[in-house]
Amino acid sequence: MKKKIYAALAFALYATTFHAQQIYELSAPAKEKTIYTGHLKMGGSNPSGGNISVNSYYMSIDGKPVIPVMGEFHFTRYPRAQWEQEIVKMKAGGVNVLPTYIFWGLHEEEEGKFCWSGNKDLRHFIELCKKHDMPVIVRIGPFCHGEIRNGSIPDWLFARPVDVRSNQPLYLSYVKRLYGEIGRQLQGLYYKDGGPIIGCQLENEMQHSASPWGVNYPGEPLDFTVASYDIDYAMIGVSVMDKKVTTAELGEEHMRTLKRMAQEEGIITPFYTATGWGNAAVIDNEAIPVTSAYTYPFWEEPRMSPFCMFKDIHRVPDYAPVRYDAERFPSFCAEMGAGIQMIYRRRPIVTARAAQALMIRTLGSGSNGIGYYMYHGGSTPLRQDK
């Protein structure tokens, strides 16, 4: 009898406690997404009737929304004889867009003497991409960074009275000549011609980053690969820059000039891109400002990455503040540090598990384009005279 009484009391106490509990409700409603169309001066068609368009949220190919999965492969850093098999493997791995840098300093080691043969045969590489239906984004510089000497500005140019990455007419004349050479190599291979080239990146991290002299030459200033008026904004690597850029108009003018010169030399693609992170210069409504996420940056000391947390990345891009209205452009994270350069004092190893987590976090945060930088490894070649 006592056992029954104790059991009844215990049940009554449990029921009273249960009903007395405060019930909380968690709600995380998604903000209704407004998709803008028609404001971006980009898009194009090919001879077979295909078309590419872009709105404020995503890219469409032949009228269907797509998520570009970009895999970076620098052809000049890998043997020509193996290019084709590597392109095929990348496609089998799920890559549907291949971006590649055109490193000025490798193609014009001596002033006026351009090399487009052997492992530097740009045209052959793009033709192989066409053969295997691999869309391409050409990153034409002139400054590339790309973890290469001078950001790929040729050594000989520093012996001339030029202000690199500036609006100086002399510097721009050298860039114009470079673009002319690139344009001739790519003739007939653009999307409008039935070729694989769907995009073109202009410059790299304009008014944000310079080639990492501070890494390669410890103690040296950061003023060798940046315009004289932008020295105060030169950083070694990708980072947050929240100070006001007082020379912003000069940077934006420079980007517009580069686009105009590229088009004059025949480099005409459905869309153009510019690295938009860290308050860098962009071309409003005329180029997609792509973003990045480096979880193992060699230019910083090891620390917890901020890129483990989900957020509305379309509204607040990584490495904000930025110099554009993020919600009027699609979020394409073009440089996700799935691979990274090693230096003597910092040798990060990016595991496949870490790269996968970064991709899931970025897509889950609302990005509609991801880019593995790097997807394919390689080694920077020595100078021909070495």
Q: For the regions a protein language model found, what residue spans apply to each?
A:
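Bacterial Sec-dependent N-terminal signal peptides
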Residues: 1-22
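N-terminal carbohydrate-binding accessory modules
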Residues: 21-97, 127
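Conserved, mostly hydrophobic/aromatic
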Residues: 63, 90, 98, 129, ...
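Short, well-ordered coil/turn segments that N-cap beta-strands
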Residues: 67, 94-96, 130-136, 191-198, ...
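Aromatic-lined substrate-binding rim segments of carbohydrate-active enzymes
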Residues: 83-151, 155-156, 259, 263
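Active-site-adjacent "subsite" loops/lids of carbohydrate-active enzymes
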Residues: 144-186
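Active-site neighborhood of glycoside hydrolase catalytic domains
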Residues: 174-273, 277
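Catalytic-core region of carbohydrate-active enzymes that cleave or remodel glycosidic bonds
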Residues: 252, 257-273, 302-385
